[in-house]
Amino acid sequence: MTPPPPSPLLGTQVKEDRADYKEFQDFSSLPDTHNIAWDHSFYPFQEEEEHGVKGVESVLEKGVLDEGVLEAWGCCRRCRHAGWNRSQPSPELAGAVIHARAPAVGCRQRSGHLHVRLKQRLLERPCQEPLGKKYQLELPPLYERARKPEGSKNLPADGQGLRAVRADAALPVWPGGPGRPGPHAPEAGAEGQHQGQWPPADTRHLRTPKWPYKVATEEKPEAEEAEKKRQAKVQEKRLPPWKKRTLNQVHRVPWGQHRACQVMLLVSTKQLQRYLHFEKPAKPANMGQDPDCFGKSEGELATCLCGGESVVGETEAPGVRPDPRPEKDAKPAVSGCQEESWLQSEYDEMHPREEMNVPSLRSGSGCQVSGSPLAKGLHPLQPCHPHYMMWECCLFTLTLGTQACFEVCARRLKLAHFCPDTSLWSCGGQSPPVLCQLLDIISVSRDKVIGSHEKKPSSNPNQDDFHSSEYAYRCGIAEAVGLPSIPVHPIGYYDAEKLLEYESLLLQVSEPVNPELSAGPITGLLDRLSGFRDHGPPGSSCRSQRKGNGVETKDQAHRNRDPRGFQGGVLTARLFKMQVSLELFCGHQEHYLTRPVLAPGYPVHLGKAGTHWEQGPNMPTPEQHGTWGNRHLFAVLPLLFYTSLEIMSIGYSVVMAGRNVWQPTKGQMPHQPEQSCQTLALPMTIRHSWEGGAIRESSGWVSWKCHLKATEASQNPCVRATALRVGCSAVTYGVLGQAQGSAPWTSAFKTFSAGIAGLERHAWETM
């Protein structure tokens, strides 16, 4: 469609066609008058070409002289679209100040172009309606607008400002750009003053591009070669990647380093079924030692623990800082180990990718402490007996701060602390063997290292100063590497307060309790907690359907908070799906926590997958179920304690016991068989801190404890583990040993806590 000729100038007689004018009495009936900011509000759809920008050329060609201003004034006076159905003229519709902006309206780049383009459209179509005198009518000074710095991207070339652009296109063009010089433009001499200010025309499209084959044959190989050289230089600066050594790997911790360094201490399970069950130990042996290491001094023990080749046990001279990096092209001493790739983290910590649940005891330098049976003094080839067991899983992380800490710790790793024979316990026959006896000086805080430089706490649990210092085994979640992201649904503050109040009553008991009545407090606590409702974690399918009081259903977020900022809800076992790989114990199976476990300290046994939980003293024997067989039982001890009103710690203890460890005897409390038996608890404590209702950090803790073994004086012990506040992260377990008559209560002992680094999210998932 050919655009119409430009509008005639003032004073020119033009034959008017009456068909072009039409009187409207009701302006609301006009088509498309609802939106003044849209291009179609003034001109019907698809008529832009008919009413293009060509009509304003006659105005812009005049320049900035008085004649051009008068002509623009005449055009605005004849614009019939301005001020329709208004007593006052509208500056939005016909405001002659083209580049004016409304002060109360935020004008973006797109809306600014629309506003200016709209006013230019109004100047193209003259009208007969008068305009108010208070609106100044003028055109922008073209040459002053064009005075931009050289190389400016928003400066169009000569003649580029008269493009036909839709009002809503918002292209980066200058609506008030300079037009073509008209008859009233300055002379050539005056125009030459501004010639140096115009940028050169863009001729990039005229350049001849290179042929594709030339780019492929010349430039691409050169670029690839340069990239290879750059990567080679970067690789030279990097440390060699760590390799997993199943027996020995030297990795020193820098001397005096106050940052928490996580080191994995695991136990190998390649031959688990051969040595986890034994009938009687042959003789006491140091943990991880070969028979050749017996009788050696403590100074030689650490070297023997690491295979005799490691430098872990060497004593560093005072003030000498060992190089934390391994020597270049140096091969660590290994024997019969298989190299596998490890994950390289920020602090050069070694965490396996696939064998998160496969224990392998490793020292602070990254070397394997024990690579064969847990103790060479045991009889690994003896047949499995259902009544006896050793440590079934040793999976925890030890936080080390300096090399000296590990040296002292490694010299205390002795099997005598773990031997089931009470005569071999270093602390006497009344105290159970606990792991913290061995690791009593390992602690890293934010400001100092508690180790050989300060007074060491007692390693005897019967003494008062045993682990009396406050420990911070993890400085914070930002400084921890390898921690799993374990979601936690915290217990309600009111429920936790009632639970702690009831637990405090259990701790006030100072006399032996009749075995027939010992289950009373546990039963009462279960009755008290039976009314608790589990709302489940956000997004879970087991959320409560109960409505009201701010309790959400389905996938709604929790909004039930009390004034202290604690999130509402109840912590139960349903909140976690504990997916345990039983490859370490009894084949490839999975066990799930299917029912809430609310009895603190009372073992709740789980049989084979698919069986139900059993609580209370009248638990049937494994033979009555017919599905347990020689499988191991799992017991869960939920732990809940507050270190302060702002910090809440929640824990689970997973106890692995033998098949016939707990048996009911004529309705009385379960007792242990005459033979000695030990169980290992792995409580999982999730530590959360609240500041104004927001979770500040989330850390994992692992604690270890060993149940009291049966002795001649106490055949029916009832072990309860109650979590108390000790420092900021340590856990104290009150172990109450009872017998039929007069069995003394044993003193409480504490467990060693450390951060979790071996468990991954696949081991702990929300249901």
From Swiss-Prot:
GO cellular component: plasma membrane
Annotated protein name in UniProt: Putative uncharacterized protein ENSP00000334305
GO molecular function: carboxypeptidase activity
Compositionally biased region (Basic and acidic residues): 322-331, 552-564
Region (Disordered): 171-209, 314-340, 533-566
Species classification: Eukaryota, Metazoa, Chordata, Craniata, Vertebrata
